[in-house]
A protein has these predicted regions:
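Histidine-/acidic-rich catalytic cores in large beta-rich domains
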Residues: 24-466
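Bacterial N-terminal signal peptides that target proteins for export
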Residues: 1-9
Length: 466
C-alpha cells in the first residue's frame, strides 16, 4: 500500500497543478520525436531515458530509437565503460517490480545491472533487510565498484510521527550484495533547517495523511560530489565521496559528510530577505523571496520550490564544481512556498561557496513566456561538454538542449506514452520522463546506428493539419 499511495501522492501533486492557475496546458495534439535539431550548435550524443511504457530507451539526435531494454529505471543510469572493465552499454535499472500497479517506483523487489543484450550481470534486493530493494529516485555506481541506492524504509521519525512512516535511506552495497554504509533521512531531521512552524506543519501533514507518503521529505537526488576545485583548495565540505541530496517536499539541497553522516552544507529551505554577499568581483543581492524571473547574475539564490537533480558539475565539463539544479517551482515547502502567478521553472547554476546564481535558464531566455518552460515535478538538467545544457521538462516528456544564451538547438518529445490510472481513478495518457542522461557515442557498441540530419521546425503560425 505504501508503494501505490506514494506514487499517487507524487502524481496527484501534478494533477493539482494542472487543475489550478499554477500550470500550463498541454495541447491534445502535438508532434513527438525530434522537433528541432541544429547539428552545428548541439552537443551530439545519444540520450537515455525510461518512459511510462515500462521500457528504457536509447535515442539518437534525430529521435530514432537505437536500443531498448524491457526494464524501467527510476532513473536508469548508463555506466561509463571505465566502470565495467571496458564493456559498453551497461545500465542500472529496476529488475523486478512489486505487486501493486505503481510498485515499480517505491516497492520494487530487485535492482540490477544489465548488459547491452539485456543480460543481468549484477542484482540486489532479496539481500535487503526487508527482502526487497525498494529503490527509488536515484542510483549511482561508485568508483570502488559499490553501488549507492536511495531506498524506502518504514520507522517512526522523532518529532514527526510516533507511528512508523515511509522514510528514505541511502545504502551503499558491495559487489557481493553486502550493505556497507547507510544514512537515514529521518535521523537528521534537526539538521535540515526546518523552522518551528514548518515542523508543526510537517507533523500535521503526516497525521492527516495517515503516514502513507513514499518518503517523508521526498529526497529525489543522491549523487557523490566527485573531484572538485573547492576540495582541492582545502574546503573539506566538498570531499569527493560526500553526497549531495535534495528534498522535493521541503525545498532544501544539502551535502552529507560520508564519514560522519552529518549535514555539512545546506541551501534552503527558507531564504533570507535583503541579504548582501560578495560573489567573485561582483556584489550579489537577494532583494526578496522572489523576483522569480530576474535575469541579473550574479545574485544570491532566491527561493527554490520542489527542485530536482541537484548535483555538482563533474570535472572536465564547463563550469565544473558549480551546482546545477532544476528548480521546478512546484508546490512545496513547510510552510508552503508562495508561487508566482506566471508559473515557470528554472535551471540554476550556483557557486556553492558564495551561494550566488552565476547562470540560469528560464523560458524567457528562449524568447518564450515564463510559462513556456514548466514542470511542477520530476525533471533534470545536465551540463554537456560544449557548454550546452540538456534539460528534461519531465511533466510533459520534453527533452531539449539550450546554449548558454538560451537558444534551443535540439528538442525531442517522448512518444512512448501509456494510459495510467491516477488519483481520480481515471485513465489518462501520460508521457512523463523522470530524468534524461546524455550518453557519449563511445559508451555503446561501435555498430550502434546514429543519425545526425538537421531538423528545422516549421513556422507554428502556418503549421496546420489538413
Amino acid at each position: 500500500m505504501i508503494g501505490r499511495s506514494a506514487l499517487v501522492f507524487l502524481l496527484s501533486v501534478a494533477l493539482v497543478c494542472i487543475m489550478t492557475d499554477q500550470a500550463i496546458a498541454q495541447p491534445s495534439v502535438f508532434p513527438t520525436g525530434t522537433t528541432i535539431y541544429d547539428p552545428a550548435k548541439a552537443y551530439n550524443s545519444y540520450v537515455l531515458f525510461s518512459a511510462p511504457d515500462g521500457n528504457t530507451h536509447l535515442i539518437d539526435m534525430d529521435g530514432n530509437e537505437v536500443h531498448r531494454w524491457n526494464k524501467f529505471g527510476f532513473p536508469p543510469e548508463m555506466l561509463d565503460p571505465e566502470q565495467t572493465v571496458g564493456d559498453k552499454g551497461h545500465i542500472l535499472v529496476q529488475l523486478e517490480n512489486g505487486s501493486s500497479p505503481f510498485g515499480n517506483i517505491f516497492d520494487n523487489r530487485e535492482v540490477g545491472e544489465l548488459d547491452w543484450n539485456g543480460n543481468t550481470v549484477w542484482r540486489w534486493g532479496t539481500q535487503a533487510p526487508s527482502g526487497k530493494a525498494r529503490q527509488n529516485h536515484d542510483i549511482s555506481r561508485l568508483p570502488n565498484g559499490n553501488t549507492l541506492l536511495l531506498t524506502t524504509i518504514e520507522h517512526p521519525v522523532a518529532g514527526v510521527s510516533e507511528q512508523a512512516i515511509a522514510d528514505q535511506q541511502i545504502v551503499e552495497v558491495s559487489k557481493e550484495g553486502q550493505i556497507v554504509w547507510t544514512w537515514t533521512a529521518g535521523d537528521h531531521i534537526n539538521e535540515f533547517g526546518i523552522s518551528p512552524e514548518g515542523r508543526s506543519l510537517l507533523r500535521e501533514a503526516y497525521r492527516a495523511s495517515k503516514q502513507e507518503f513514499g518518503g517523508f521529505l521526498t529526497i529525489n537526488n543522491m549523487q557523490p560530489i566527485g573531484s572538485n576545485r573547492f576540495f582541492d583548495a582545502g574546503d573539506k565540505r566538498f570531499a569527493p565521496d560526500n553526497i549531495m541530496i535534495d528534498s522535493r517536499e521541503v525545498s532544501f539541497i544539502a551535502i552529507i559528510d560520508k564519514q560522519t553522516g552529518k549535514i555539512v552544507w545546506r541551501l534552503g529551505p527558507d531564504y533570507a530577505v535583503g541579504n548582501q554577499q560578495t560573489g567573485g568581483s561582483a556584489t550579489v543581492t537577494n532583494t526578496s523571496l522572489r523576483p522569480r524571473f530576474s535575469l541579473a547574475v550574479p545574485r544570491l539564490v532566491d527561493q527554490t520550490s520542489g527542485q530536482h537533480d541537484a548535483h555538482i558539475i563533474p570535472q572536465g565539463l564547463p563550469s565544473a564544481g558549480n551546482l546545477l539544479v532544476f528548480d521546478n517551482e512546484g508546490p512545496s515547502g513547510f510552510p508552503p512556498t508562495r508561487l508566482s502567478v506566471e508559473s515557470g521553472s528554472r535551471i540554476l547554476e550556483i557557486d556553492p561557496q558564495t551561494k550566488a546564481i552565476v547562470w540560469q535558464y528560464t523560458g524567457i531566455d528562449s524568447k518564450q513566456p515564463a510559462w513556456g518552460f514548466y514542470s511542477s515535478f520530476i525533471s533534470s538538467a545536465r551540463r554537456l561538454p560544449n557548454g550546452n545544457t540538456l534539460i528534461d521538462e519531465g511533466m510533459t516528456g520534453r527533452l531539449f538542449q539550450v546554449t548558454r544564451s538560451g537558444e534551443i538547438v535540439w528538442e525531442y518529445v517522448n512518444p512512448y506514452s501509456i494510459r495510467q490510472k491516477l488519483d481520480l481513478d481515471r485513465e489518462v495518457l501520460a508521457n512523463w520522463v523522470y530524468r534524461a542522461q546524455p550518453i557519449p557515442y563511445n559508451w555503446v557498441p561501435d555498430e550502434t546506428p546514429c543519425q545526425e540530419a538537421a531538423i528545422k521546425p516549421p513556422n507554428n503560425s502556418k503549421f496546420h493539419l489538413s
